[in-house]
From Swiss-Prot:
Active site residues according to the UniProt entry: 238
Species in which this protein is naturally found: Xanthomonas oryzae pv. oryzae (strain MAFF 311018)
Disulfide bonds: none
Gene name of this polypeptide: lpxD
Name of the protein: UDP-3-O-acylglucosamine N-acyltransferase
An annotated GO cellular component: membrane
Length: 337
């Protein structure tokens, strides 16, 4: 596919600087773009690459336009504009409607004639798959699940039981949704299992990364509101609620019954303690541990910054002495009084 710079600008409301007839057939980074490829400049860190870039077209802010040596598309947010343009060149494999002969469909399940069910898929009792859905190879949909219109399960996705997906949900390979929550009670020195009788509800336009696990609730449902984005290898425990338009980066873990507000961002490897609440529009930086509820929007961090090992070891040793040192300082202050 080839598009002119003018056609792209018209579709996304951008301003053309230079030759609007320049053709684009693909996208690439500034450093590696070549003839016929479009790139973007969003982070000032990469501004030095602009002068040497061989990109046919560059999406950038007005402030950077003078440095562009070829055709440019001016956008308020170059990264968002680039994401929309790149989608034009992301040609997905077309899956024709139909059920593969190797798939198993329970007699009580309902599968839309417009859905695609791939090889070795299993769909359990009373489950429903909507129009335009794609169920990838080897996926398992257990009993009493709903996959609403336009949703896609890539290869080997598991919906255990009582999982309800909204419209246009996308789940990547290996994800497990609706497994038992980690509910245990101690009885006479032995653990007994607390039945997990709830389900999982995932709203419209959510995306779940590869090998992520979202457990079903004990009594009520675990809920992801609409347009939540979850990266790979994330654990969301039972009875959590994730607010709309929030995003959670890889290797994060959210303990049971935690509530995260709308438009929140969690960096990689963030830990959230159970039974607390995070308000709307909170950013938690990577490797942080959230031990208390957060009631004010803003950016929060925890942990020790990276330093050379020798300095870190000295500081770690001093950390153990903080209480003793603090008591000495207080004692000196009282003596001076």
């Amino acid at each position: 596919m080839r598009l002119t710079a003018s056609a792209i600008a018209g579709q996304f409301g951008l301003t053309v600087l230079g030759d609007g007839s320049t053709e684009v057939s693909g996208v690439a980074t500034l450093a590696h773009a070549g003839a016929g490829q479009l790139s973007f400049l969003s982070n000032p860190r990469y501004r030095p690459q602009l002068a040497d870039s061989q990109a046919a077209v560059v999406v950038l802010r007005a402030d950077d336009a003078e440095a562009a040596k070829g055709t440019a598309l001016v956008a308020k947010d170059p990264y968002t504009a680039f994401a929309k343009i790149a989608a034009l060149f992301d040609v997905a494999q077309v899956c024709e409607p139909g059920i593969h002969p190797s798939a198993f469909i329970d007699p009580t399940a309902q599968v839309s004639p417009g859905a695609h069910v791939g090889p070795f898929v299993s769909i359990g009792a009373r489950s429903r798959v909507g129009d335009g859905c794609v169920i990838g190879t080897g996926s398992l949909i257990g009993a009493d699940c709903v996959v609403d219109d336009g949703s896609e399960l890539l290869a080997r996705v598991t919906l255990v039981t009582r999982v309800r997906l909204g419209k246009r949900v996308r789940i990547h390979p290996g994800a497990v949704i609706g497994a038992d929550g980690f509910g245990l009670a101690m009885d006479a020195g032995h653990w007994i299992k607390v039945p997990q009788l709830g389900g999982v509800v995932i709203g419209d336009d959510c995306e779940i990364g590869a090998n992520t696990c979202i457990d079903r609730g004990a009594l009520e449902d675990t809920v992801l509101e609409e347009d939540v984005r979850v990266d790979n290898l994330v654990q969301i425990a039972h009875n959590c609620r994730i607010g709309a338009h929030s995003a959670i980066a890889g290797c994060s873990g959210i303990a049971g019954s935690a509530k995260i507000g709308r438009y929140c961002l969690l960096g990689g490897h963030v830990g959230v303690v159970g039974h607390l609440e995070i308000c709307d529009k909170v950013v938690i930086t990577g490797k942080s541990v959230v031990r208390n509820s957060i009631n004010e929007p803003g950016e929060y961090s925890s942990g020790t910054p990276l330093t050379d090992n020798r300095t870190w070891r000295k500081n770690a040793a001093r950390f153990k002495q903080l209480d003793v040192l603090a008591r000495r300082i207080l004692a000196v202050g009282k003596e001076k009084e």
